[in-house]
A protein has these predicted regions:
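Divalent metal-binding acidic/histidine catalytic loops
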Residues: 1-138
Length: 138
């Protein structure tokens, strides 16, 4: 009950706040930006890693998430690759939402990943024979 009161007090005091969506002056600014990341062995008991993603549209934050991966990754490259795949799925869904809201936007996405091995794996998955097991996990 105390947590509910705390939330209601917070909402009452922040009714004047909101998200600012500036007008796009450039078609390159009018894209959906996404960041994804995965931790390094955060859960030592279950061995599942936590991944996060964050989205901006017109330079304003619109969505974020942090949750445990559903599978056990064998390496940091695999964990980052899975996080990027989950982020891409969310991005496709957000583009459908923007279409449903009749927002005029350029269909482009910028996905930022901080692991060079995962980026190389995403660019050329055919040359990586040791990554076939990832497809069956997703």
């Amino acid at each position: 009950m105390a947590a509910t009161k705390h939330i209601l007090r917070y909402l009452k005091e922040t009714t004047g706040y909101g998200l600012l969506f500036p007008v796009s002056l450039n078609e390159f600014e009018d894209c959906l930006e996404a960041w994804s990341d995965s931790d390094w062995c955060g859960d030592k008991v279950g061995r599942k890693r936590t991944y996060e993603y964050f989205f901006k549209y017109l330079k304003a934050p619109i969505s974020w998430c942090s949750k445990k991966q559903t599978v056990v990754a064998l390496s940091s490259c695999e964990a980052e690759y899975i996080a990027a795949a989950e982020t891409t799925c969310q991005c496709v869904w957000l583009e459908y939402v923007l279409d449903d809201l009749k927002l005029d936007h350029v269909k482009s996405m910028q996905l930022c990943v901080d692991n060079q091995s995962a980026i190389n794996l995403a660019k050329n998955p055919i040359s990586h024979g040791r990554s076939k097991h990832i497809e069956t996990k997703l």
